[in-house]
From Swiss-Prot:
Pfam families on file: Curlin_rpt (PF07012)
Main subcellular location of this protein, as a coarse class: other
Superkingdom, natural source: Bacteria
Stretch forming the signal peptide: 1-20
Region (Disordered): 71-90
Keyword Signal: yes
Keywords: Fimbrium, Signal
Protein name: Major curlin subunit
Length: 151
């Protein structure tokens, strides 16, 4: 496992099988937990961000039986998440106000996406092109919006 912690940018890139990556970030104002590209079966990618104005970009490809977790606490955070694999999961949690999330899961089966947003003015856009799969979006607060598509 590699861990890079930089005040402005944190990136994690792995290729292979049975890999794990974690990017913890604390503080606010422009942390970017991004460039997370985690490929190969049985992979795990975790990004944790605390503070406001953070962004997370994560991608898992050809990653059957893999998990992708993003947790953001604070306001004005954004997450862009993609996963293309079978038997895999995405779990995104955002707490605060004015957060946004875009999640895509494609070419998979038996996969799941869970989005939880707590606070006000949050938005989520979820697209899933997968068979025998599930999407669960929970928003608690006011002025939130969500769009979900399954194909």
């Amino acid at each position: 496992m590699k861990l890079l912690k930089v005040a402005a940018i944190a990136a994690i890139v792995f290729s292979g099988s049975a890999l794990a990556g974690v990017v913890p970030q604390y503080g606010g104002g422009g942390n970017h937990g991004g460039g997370g590209n985690n490929s190969g079966p049985n992979s795990e990618l975790n990004i944790y961000q605390y503070g406001g104005g953070n962004s997370a970009l994560a991608l898992q490809t050809d990653a059957r039986n893999s998990d992708l977790t993003i947790t953001q606490h604070g306001g004005g955070n954004g997450a862009d998440v993609g996963q293309g694999s079978d038997d895999s999961s995405i779990d995104l949690t955002q707490r605060g106000f004015g957060n946004s999330a875009t999640l895509d899961q494609w070419n998979g089966k038996n996969s799941e996406m869970t989005v939880k947003q707590f606070g006000g003015g949050n938005g989520a856009a979820v697209d899933q092109t997968a068979s025998n799969s599930s999407v669960n979006v929970t928003q608690v607060g006011f002025g939130n919006n969500a769009t979900a598509h399954q194909y």
